[in-house]
């Protein structure tokens, strides 16, 4: 793979990802510390959003220590060169939340939908572009798109709604490099040359670095990651590792390798409540093609009902569940527990 001389823009998702091992307990001091330190290695764009995006204070997760606006207004004035992005989920975030974020100084809005439901993003993408924001159509669980469908969904966003970047998002960490190359290639062939493509990977199958390289080779100019690999499941693409790999391959990132290594080791790792690694449950997420954020829900259900999280995740994958169906995990675990009890009685 020869990428010598190519440029790539890396985006840090650490604060969004920090909500997974430390669900919604992040303080203003922590929210300020991570972006301001990431500013030094010259990270160009930093995500500052709650787990469910703008307006995402939800009983599905945990109520955060602070609201979106408090976090944004605390961080953005302290950044010297990095820009700030925010996640917005149609059905959760509203135009009022969008206006608030832009008023706080957010420059990029990621409008996230399930990969086959991009049509629900029309109003949000259109409004974001009308207000002058760098606007991304963030297509989640991209592995679930049948061959040839991803380009159609993306064209809908770009031509009808005006997104200037489309993301292929491997939310389950399921895809292999050839699959990433194929999907990115389809997007690049169908989209206007001026429309950028991004790739967001998860490390559940240990493929985040390889998949990000495949995405970049296929035409993705924006690559997501997080320092120390923070993120759901086995985490996102570890940025410090990816920067080192890019440096070895002659790909220009504009990021200071030693400084981002230090941020990961000295600041982020000590903030973790638990290590992020490819354990059996995270590996099952990737193998079964399950939304990475389901991991903690499945582990909680295991403790409550005695059904192994791995078995719950495999069944969720078999049923083709998608992000937003967290309530099904509890019901499924209860059903599986009852079925096991009946088997014991009949035996």
Curated annotation (Swiss-Prot):
InterPro entries: 2-IPM_HCS-like, 4OH_2_O-val_aldolase, Aldolase_TIM, DmpG_comm, DRE_TIM_HOA, PYR_CT. Mn(2+) binds at residues 200, 202. It catalyses: (S)-4-hydroxy-2-oxopentanoate = acetaldehyde + pyruvate. The active site is at 20 (proton acceptor). Substrate binds at residues 171, 200, 291. One of its GO terms (molecular function) is 4-hydroxy-2-oxovalerate aldolase activity. One of its GO terms (biological process) is L-leucine biosynthetic process. Signal peptide: none annotated. Keywords: Aromatic hydrocarbons catabolism, Lyase, Manganese, Metal-binding. Its EC number is 4.1.3.39. Residues 8-261 form the Pyruvate carboxyltransferase domain. The keyword Metal-binding applies. PANTHER family: 2-ISOPROPYLMALATE SYNTHASE 1, CHLOROPLASTIC-RELATED, HOMOCITRATE SYNTHASE-RELATED. Belongs to the 4-hydroxy-2-oxovalerate aldolase family. HAMAP family: HOA (MF_01656). This is 4-hydroxy-2-oxovalerate aldolase 1. It comes from Metapseudomonas furukawaii.
């Amino acid at each position: 793979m020869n990428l010598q001389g190519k440029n790539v823009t890396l985006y840090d998702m650490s604060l969004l990802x920090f909500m997974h091992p430390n669900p919604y307990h992040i303080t203003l001091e922590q929210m300020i510390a991570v972006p301001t330190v990431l500013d030094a290695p010259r990270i160009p764009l930093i995500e500052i959003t709650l787990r469910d995006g703008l307006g995402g204070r939800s009983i599905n997760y945990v109520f955060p220590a602070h609201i979106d606006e408090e976090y944004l207004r605390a961080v953005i004035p302290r950044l010297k060169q990095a820009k700030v992005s925010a996640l917005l989920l149609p059905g959760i975030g509203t135009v009022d939340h969008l206006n608030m974020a832009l008023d706080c100084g957010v420059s990029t809005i990621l409008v996230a939908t399930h990969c086959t439901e991009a049509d629900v993003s029309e109003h949000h993408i259109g409004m974001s572009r009308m207000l002058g924001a760098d606007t991304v159509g963030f297509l989640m669980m991209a592995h679930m798109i049948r061959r040839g469908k991803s380009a159609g969904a993306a064209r809908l966003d770009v031509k009808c709604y005006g997104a200037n970047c489309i993301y292929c998002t491997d939310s389950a960490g399921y895809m292999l490099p050839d699959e990433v190359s194929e999907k990115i290639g389809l997007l690049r062939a169908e989209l206007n040359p001026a429309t950028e493509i991004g790739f967001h990977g998860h490390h559940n199958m240990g493929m985040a670095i390889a998949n990000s390289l495949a995405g970049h080779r296929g035409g993705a100019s924006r690559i997501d990651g997080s320092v120390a690999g923070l993120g759901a499941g086995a985490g996102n693409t570890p940025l410090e590792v990816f920067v080192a790999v890019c440096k070895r391959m002659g790909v220009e990132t504009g990021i200071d390798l030693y400084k981002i290594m230090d941020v990961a080791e000295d600041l982020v790792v000590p903030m973790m409540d638990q290590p992020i690694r490819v354990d059996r449950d995270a590996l099952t997420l990737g193998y079964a093609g399950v939304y990475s954020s389901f991991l903690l829900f499945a582990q909680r259900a295991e403790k409550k009902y005695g059904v192994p999280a791995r078995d719950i995740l495999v069944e969720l994958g078999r049923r083709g569940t998608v992000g937003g169906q967290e309530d099904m995990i509890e019901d499924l675990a209860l059903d599986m527990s009852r079925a096991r009890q009946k088997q014991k009685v009949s035996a």
